[in-house]
Amino acid sequence: MIKEKDWYFDFLRGIAIVMVIAIHTYVAVDEINGIVLIRQAMNCAVPLFLAISGYFIGKKDLSSLEKYNAFLKKQLPRVYVPMLLWSIPFLLINFRHSGIHLGMLTAFLGGCSVFYFIILIIEFYLLTPIIQKVSLSKSLAVSSLITLVGIILFVYLMHIKCYNIPLYLNGTPFLLWLVFYVLGVKFGNGVSFIWWFLSLAFFFLFASLGETYFYSINGKVA
């Protein structure tokens, strides 16, 4: 029998999946409207997936090197091997354009389609023991600062300096997503800060919608 809490997280995963589908079926428009705002709201899909992953991984006992190694030996092949297998069709399709060596390197780095998420989650698997040991206040403060600085840096490089950074390079750095995974880990460890979390979540949601609106005034709709 599935526990009630498992149903809850299955529901959240379903919502996140719908958001991902909406993101990848969205067509950019040239003016601000309700569709653009909805598209911006859908951007919480990846953070939601990371928080859910952090919740369950954070419950695991990784206090010793033996337990940590056993966890990695079990978990890494479960996500990395399927990614490599599903990358094969992309390698065959793009063989003439990128060549076998560059194509294989891209595949190993999660560069086929949206597989960057697999590399990202592997990074968090490696960081989980450190996150578990750091106190709530320190982990939230440090992770929030790191994520903020990371986002500012990549926005500067991609939208101001106009560097063409591919998705598998601008999406995989853990520093861009760290705070979301940390929140999940701390929830998984039984720390309760739901009202503070919801207030922060809604603040940044409306801030992102405002950013989209003012950004679109200059004819640049995200």
Task: Name each model feature, range by range.
Residues 2-6, 61-74, 129-141, 185-197:
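Membrane-interface helix-boundary motifs at transmembrane edges
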Residues 2-36, 42-43:
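N-terminal signal-anchor module of multipass membrane proteins
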Residues 16, 40-48, 59-93, 98-115, ...:
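Transmembrane alpha-helical segments and their boundary/interface "anchor" motifs
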Residues 24-31, 57-58, 91-98, 155, ...:
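Transmembrane helix-loop junctions and nearby membrane-interface residues
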Residues 47-59, 180-187:
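Hydrophobic transmembrane alpha-helices of secondary-active transporters
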Residues 90-192:
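Hydrophobic alpha-helical segments with transmembrane-like composition
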Residues 192-222:
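Alpha-helical transmembrane segments and terminal signal-anchor/GPI-anchor hydrophobic tails
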